[in-house]
A protein has these predicted regions:
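Short, hydrophobic alpha-helical packing/hinge segments within bilobed ligand-binding/sensory domains
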Residues: 67-68, 86, 124, 136
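Periplasmic-binding protein-like
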Residues: 17-26, 49-53, 60-61, 92-118, 130-153, 160-162
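A ligand-binding cleft/hinge motif common to bilobed small-molecule-binding domains
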Residues: 77-95, 144
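Extracytoplasmic ligand-binding site segments that recognize negatively charged/polar headgroups
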Residues: 1-75
Length: 170
């Protein structure tokens, strides 16, 4: 059987019981993944969610790390999780590969901010500069498998990915 190529494939009944996915009620990443799926696909959202849920056989996993383990240990064929989680699994020795959905995926930023009127603004600005430095961005990539936000950073950007216009207010 050909592996799935996109979000739409995950609603095909041939994958019933073969998909690992963390419970979106307790996993923020799984919630974001579901929102991405629904925004990338056209059709009735209730039907898409129902078909996907049926393919999970009523057994969502307790966390994102469980998704990679289920696939890496051969208990499931497909794992739907974040890129960084999959990369950590590959680094840990699991024989898995990443497939990016043909319909597109999301790339959401993490944030760092300075509180308005804070007592030590100069130190806060220095800390933000430190976080955005090439050294820290390289460390985040090499150790935590996060994409760099710096064009000069390791694995910079998302140019090779097909990204959807993710609606944060959706």
């Amino acid at each position: 059987t050909n592996p799935p190529t996109g979000w739409g494939s995950l609603t095909d009944s041939k994958w019933r019981g073969k998909i690992a996915f963390a419970d979106p009620a307790v996993s923020g990443s799984s919630y974001t993944i579901l929102c991405t799926m629904l925004q990338a696909l056209t059709g009735d959202n209730a039907s898409i969610l129902t078909e996907f849920a049926e393919n999970l056989d009523g057994k969502p996993l307790s966390g994102s790390g469980d998704v990679v383990r289920a696939v890496g240990e051969g208990r499931k064929y497909i794992g739907v999780t974040l890129e960084e989680t999959a990369l950590k699994g590959i680094a840990a020795g699991y024989d898995i590969e990443i497939v990016y959905p043909e319909e597109g995926t999301s790339a959401l930023p993490d944030g760092a901010a300075i509180v308005s009127g804070c007592a030590h603004r100069e130190n806060a600005e220095l800390f933000i500069d430190f976080l955005l430095s090439s050294d820290v961005q390289t460390l985040l990539h090499d150790s935590l498998y996060r994409r760099s936000i710096c064009e000069s950073g390791a694995n910079a950007g998302t140019d090779e990915l097909k990204l959807i216009d993710y609606d944060l207010e959706w």
